Amino acid sequence: MDFNYSNKSIELQESLLKFFDEHIYPNEIDYDKAIEESGDPLHIPSILEDLKEEAKKINLWNLFLPDENHGPGLSNLDYAPLAEIMGRVWWSSEVFNCSAPDTGNMEILAEFGTDLQKEEWLKPLLDGQIRSCFAMTEPNVASSDATNISSSIVSDGDNYVINGRKWWTSNAINPRAEICIFMGITNPDNPPHERQSQVLVPMNTEGVTIVRPMHVFGYDDGYTGHPEVKFENVIVPKTNLIGGEGAGFKIAQARLGPVSYTHLTLPTTPYV
């Protein structure tokens, strides 16, 4: 296997490093100061939106997507050094629309979503107009094995009724998170890897409740935090199903593989 970076990746690395020198590093203090002075841990500094517009102008946008219709079409190998650079400042990945969990959610919608789902949710995510969350991990089971997931997605005519508790639901507490990808059981009698499905749940749907923020070593990560979320008799149309009933585990594997790889690159640079 050739581990050399493509010319496109090298050019993007140079452009990204220049952007950091000119825009990211000079705004680190102002970013922290804006949150501190607001007195609101969920405050989103306006500088983020300003920097996003600058990034869009020079095509430093949606760098993670291998689909050339939505991004530069980089392989995981070519994207890795870009993720390493973004890891130098913890909030910078959002400037380039490359932050979790939106990256994995956009990959799901790009690969498995219907045309309607892409128009309603993928497009505004790609444009950076909204943010999203991913609800898979549960407090009552060992969720690293997704076959243990116990939340239910029950058919009811043209709708699904969703019940369950999730936690470490990254970004669910974000005021701009408008859509959630929820994983639960639709087909309990199927083989273990074919019981789960994934559905789109708008965060303003009745029955969706943020229970509490979760803390990691004392930090709650503010507006990008990972809260516990309760879904109680949440009703969504069946058109919100992604990839068909029983496809949830397969979709989760497709999502978590590349995302885990790129997440590992993010924290490497500051410590080498």
Language-model segments: what does each one mean?
Residues 1-99, 116-120, 124-127:
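Amphipathic, small/basic residue-rich leader segments at the start of a protein or domain
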Residues 96-116, 145:
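N-terminal glycine-rich flavin-associated loop
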Residues 128-137:
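A short, Trp-centered hydrophobic/proline-enriched beta-strand micro-motif
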Residues 148, 206-234:
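Flexible, small-/acidic-enriched active-site or ligand-binding loops
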Residues 151-154:
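A structural signal for short hydrophobic beta-strand segments in well-ordered beta-sheet cores
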Residues 158-159, 163-211:
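A short core secondary-structure module
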Residues 234-250:
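Long, acidic (Asp/Glu-rich), low-complexity accessory segments flanking structured domains
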Residues 263-272:
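Single conserved hydrophobic/aromatic residue that forms the stacking wall/gate
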